Amino acid sequence: MKHNIFAVAIIPAKTDSTRLSKKNLQIVDGKTMLEHSIEYAKNSEYIKDIIVTTESKEVEEICKNYDDVKVYKRPKHLLKDAEVVDVYLDVVQEQFRIYQNFNVYHKMTHMVGIQPDHPDRTNNIDDMLDYFVDNTYDDLFTVDSKGTRNGSIRITKAQYVRKGTMSKRVGSMLDDCTNVHSEDDLEQAETNILRGRSFSG
């Protein structure tokens, strides 16, 4: 590994989607989008801990297939249209206090937010973390081919997430993946994965 990184992945996986029912549990290339995200995180050498935040028993059952994945019950006020950054902050600032005995909270150098509805993401997460450190960023988010933030990946220095303060040096990286909102999007994402045009889990 190029850098001394102890990253924690947070995967938001609610099931109260409005446009596509139980979106994060939709199947793409034989796996739910949630499973793609978990396995994407597990392929990283830098990510040492994975937490799925959800209100769903169904999601919890899927996570039981992965011994090293923790599940955090998402509070009701962070369902519906809550900002995903607030979901990330909630996990780090509240849930991580439970794990202090395991030193995860203190060891963490970076938080990696992985949204499941981008199953055909095109970047290797460890390459992104190397890019983040090499460019001395405090915060990094992915954008689509038009330069619009797409939410696929969000990397933030742990010190900012712990304190809930604003980061200063912000960067972006292209991730020309599918932002799934419909059945057509599911088909497009699967096509991209089958063509080998992704770092899918």
Spans of model-derived segments:
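Short beta-strand/turn micro-motifs composed of small residues
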Residues: 13, 54-55, 115, 143
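N-terminal nucleotide-binding beta1-loop-alpha1 segment
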Residues: 1-21
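Short, well-formed alpha-helical segments that are part of the catalytic scaffolds
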Residues: 20-43
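Conserved SAM-binding loop
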Residues: 26-27, 52, 113
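Conserved core of the sugar-phosphate nucleotidyltransferase
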Residues: 82-90, 94, 106-110, 115-184, ...
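Conserved N-terminal catalytic core of the sugar/cofactor nucleotidyltransferase
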Residues: 36-106
